[in-house]
């Protein structure tokens, strides 16, 4: 799951021409994997996942997590 989240981050960074850390930092990815949020609200409680990131990436992240339940 962590690798899939990193792959998502890498794709988004390339697509947006951003640095990887601007999409998701490694510690945030690990925390998402530990907490396994199920809703955008739960995802926004993960340290490092502010409102803007949840709005931009939340649905995609939650879809990835859904596969691992």
What are these regions (language model features)?
Residues 1-69:
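Accessory DNA-binding and partner-docking regions appended to nucleic-acid-acting proteins
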């Amino acid at each position: 799951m962590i690798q899939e989240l990193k792959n998502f981050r890498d794709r988004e960074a390339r697509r947006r021409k951003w640095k990887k850390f601007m999409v998701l930092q490694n510690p945030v990815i690990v925390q998402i994997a530990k907490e396994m949020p199920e809703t955008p609200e739960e995802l926004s409680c993960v340290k490092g996942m502010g409102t803007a990131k949840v709005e931009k990436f939340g649905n995609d992240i939650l879809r990835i997590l859904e596969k691992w339940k």
